[in-house]
Amino acid sequence: MTVSIALTICPEVKADEQPTLIKGFATAYNGPSEYTCTGKKVHEGICGGCEAYIGKTIILYQRLPGDQIGELIGIYECEDTGPGTEGFQQGYVIDVWCRNLEECQDFMNLIYTNNAQGRVWIQIVEECNG
């Protein structure tokens, strides 16, 4: 079965263009700091990733067995960096901020459904003018 998703984020994105997707993993975080590494106050919709993603929009989809695209997980602003591990530095791990540990667990449960095992497709939106 082939799944096709057309998602328009910006007016200049054409429906017939295939977005570039990166194979990766997602995690959830919560902590004592009220601010990201960029100085923004943490809030729902913030994620951490490699430094090259700072200021960009990150779209996460479940990555199902056979590398099929699963459900849309969410759309996030990358305003933080991860803990410095190889996955974060190389850009294949995204860390989604949650308000509390219960929300972290809910997020982890979501990304482990449909046998996705925490695997995600990462789409980086470079710029949105509109």
Report residues per predicted region:
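Solvent-exposed, well-ordered loop and adjacent helix/strand elements within mature globular domains
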Residues: 13-130
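Bacterial N-terminal signal peptides
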Residues: 1-8
